[in-house]
């Protein structure tokens, strides 16, 4: 379309002109104001048609937030747990005042069948995040994926490559990058007021290690209630135990998650945002001390320290009080930010 406002024909204007042409005919024709986006309504042509993949826990919270947006029309939900997908459908139908929300047990079916879906929410367990995002973008969907975006560097690189190749919008849950206290710290670091940043810190909240053992085998539930193979997805097979599925128990196991990404998905992104990463790469990684602190060195000489504060996410540290923080040190001073921050 032309950039000239006089010649641009948007979908909204196209529909409006079509309605005017119809009214010129000697035929009775009624178009509701809501169909044209009048009276505060969003025209169907301007709505974002969405589907959800993984609607338990964080996914349930995200679903509620997105349903509150007037522009969003939710048409499908997918969850490997029957109880969750049915609860999500009922919630969507109640909010939208119809019974149109379709349910799926397998995301691949949703992505293949729902050509009307513009974007998907992905809030599965961490093990599925990267692969589900890649499959969705290949199917022509834009993606909002809960953090962490991936479990490995190779997965992350493939997610980025797929978004570029298929020209898709991809966003992961790094909301602290837009919260005022973190924005202030990041902008201070980049402004030069602290001088050239030489050291940055990020709180990764690493615990005492991930479990590698198996829970005792239990009988698998019926596949229509929970398909265990689909739940495992890209992970190595192990026998079913409800302890993995209920209450986020999977999060403590190396095959299903990476503990560093719990807070690191936020804090490392915040630290990197405050540094000038143009043509910069990581050149060295080294563990220091008994608390799993990792010191990384960048090719521009900056040192990035990823450290574990302690067992409690609210345990104070020497740099700040509060969770999920970052700090930048320069020759002229320092700045730090964290959730519910108070200075040391």
PLM regions with names:
Residues 126, 130, 150-153, 179, ...:
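Conserved structured core elements
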Residues 142-144, 149-225:
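A contiguous active-site-proximal alpha/beta segment in oxidoreductase catalytic domains
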Residues 122, 148, 174, 260, ...:
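Glycine- and other small-residue-rich loops at beta-strand/loop junctions that grip anionic moieties
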Residues 33-36, 184, 196, 201-205, ...:
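Contiguous beta-strand/loop segments that form the cofactor/metal-binding neighborhood of enzyme cores
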Residues 2-145, 154-169:
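N-terminal glycine-/serine-/threonine-rich beta1-alpha1-beta2 phosphate-ribose binding loop
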Residues 71, 116, 193-196, 279:
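Glycine-centered tight turns that cap/initiate beta-strands
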